[in-house]
Amino acid sequence: MAVGVFDSGLGGLTVLSAIAARMPDLPLVYLGDNAHTPYGVRDADDIFDLTCAGVERLWAEGCDLVILACNTASAAALKRMQETWLPKDKRVLGVFVPMIEALTERRWGDNSPPREVAVKHVALFATPATVASRAFQRELAFRAIGVDVEAQPCGGVVDAIEMGDEILAEALVTSHVEALLRRMPHPEAAILGCTHYPLVQAAFQKALGPQVTVYSQPNLVAESLEDYLGRHPEMLGAGNVSRFLTTGDPERVSGKATQFLRHPIRFESA
């Protein structure tokens, strides 16, 4: 009954932690592609190939349902995977869906015409690849009208977080927020469009100010997954053991993950 969680590095651990807190009896298999992180600077074909390889590894662990806990993979690869590659008995879900649902206050299956929503000015902070894909703007346009989205590619933030350099990460966040505010001085909401960013959410909130509502993905994704599994229990795979896998050096990744989440995590080689 295991569910797979895939990310290019360690950011997806924020999503896994939220899922585990909400569904403590659900076995989860995490795969971090630390050998190839970060994805945010790669081209779409490269991201597609790496993501498919990661998802196939999780299928081998008995995970028929895999969460792409990586916005770059969700933006650059998911649609193509679902249309051209995915077997009928498997599911791959991205992390954009719950965020769009929360922002537009409508369920993903609601295919009614786009309508006005309360929030009119949205700041999007994401990796360069996610911003370049325009996937967030595209999905939002299907569901809402009259929403102005200003996107800021946040180069360097993921690298700083993966290195454990909180001071550098927070300084970069401040710089990126200031750059966006020069173009959109008064956003009403901010989307943290990378699963690494919840670890520096306080820095985003401080730089944006208390008047801006910051949407962060882990809890939204966990809530959405619980709802999905309630409607599709057949998608629980045969796996029954929680594991942490990495394409990188397990010892090094374990140390960084432990620092990342502030509790011990032991990774194995994928």
UniProtKB/Swiss-Prot annotation:
It catalyses: L-glutamate = D-glutamate. It holds the Pfam family Asp_Glu_race. GO terms for biological process: cell wall organization; peptidoglycan biosynthetic process; regulation of cell shape. Substrate binds at D7, S8, Y39, G40, N71, T72, T195, H196. Coiled coil: none annotated. It is an enzyme of class 5 (isomerase). The active site is at C70 (proton donor/acceptor), C194 (proton donor/acceptor). Its EC number is 5.1.1.3. Belongs to the aspartate/glutamate racemases family. The keyword Cell wall biogenesis/degradation applies. HAMAP family: Glu_racemase (MF_00258). Pathway: Cell wall biogenesis; peptidoglycan biosynthesis. Provides the (R)-glutamate required for cell wall biosynthesis. One of its GO terms (molecular function) is glutamate racemase activity. It comes from the Bacteria. InterPro entries: Asp/Glu/hydantoin_racemase (IPR015942), Asp/Glu_race (IPR001920), Asp/Glu_racemase_AS_1 (IPR018187), Glu_race (IPR004391). This is Glutamate racemase. Keywords: Cell shape, Cell wall biogenesis/degradation, Isomerase, Peptidoglycan synthesis.
